């Protein structure tokens, strides 16, 4: 039996709050009704995932860092030090493996690594910086090539390794264009979500997806009237079948697979444009027989960081 539940992650298990049989639209597509109350269901993390605890060994001063994990592969954990700009590689046992720092202004360097992806098979380290440029190095810092991005695009955080030959990303520059159009009272049509799949070797565009969206701003409007783009939206999530595309402006999650039609997976109701305070869908993760989603709320000019975030879960088998 399929079901939808709200869930709150806590320690190593989930509290599912509210659970009712899954509602289906007339076309059979599953949806979440955020106005409804669902019963509670508890799920332990160990029931849906293999849990491993790793302590990254920083006894060597060269591997001390202040930052976050950027990439996890079959055998490696990649961390970026936010102070020095160094990129550090640890084994899955937490032991230091290699490191490099190519921070600088030169043609073979990065200003600061905003996003790092690691392809362990080819030993390619993709480093995105503020210039919207992607440099490619080995895990020891040997320079390989620059990967041209489609003109005018800016992947930043919304980028994943799609397969052995390609990267998949959302052009976050569209959010800046929307703010500029609003500020200049422009009538430019910028209400769409652009996604690209590009070659890891030369940056060639292999596929382009353009999702239409509701013309509504999801970020914050300050007291001075300035628009601030929304933070924390996870628009691309890897899945076993391809990638899940979360498009909150249209309340829908799509499944993208290579050489196959785009498939809607689930949507939220009521629509983002009709809710007050505004609620929008964020993130969608497949894990085992379950699918997890978040719903954020914007009350007035404040983002829902200060408001309870609702977590939903459904059994989709």
Language model: regions and residue ranges:
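Beta-strand-rich domains and repeat architectures in extracellular enzymes and scaffolds
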Residues: 51-85
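Structural signature of eukaryotic scaffold interfaces centered on beta-propeller domains
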Residues: 68-71, 116-120, 158-164, 223-240, ...
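Blade-loop segments of beta-propeller domains
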Residues: 57-62, 95-122, 129, 151
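Asp-box/WD-like beta-propeller blade repeats and closely related beta-sheet repeat scaffolds
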Residues: 130-193, 208-216
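Loop-centered beta-sheet repeat module
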Residues: 195-257
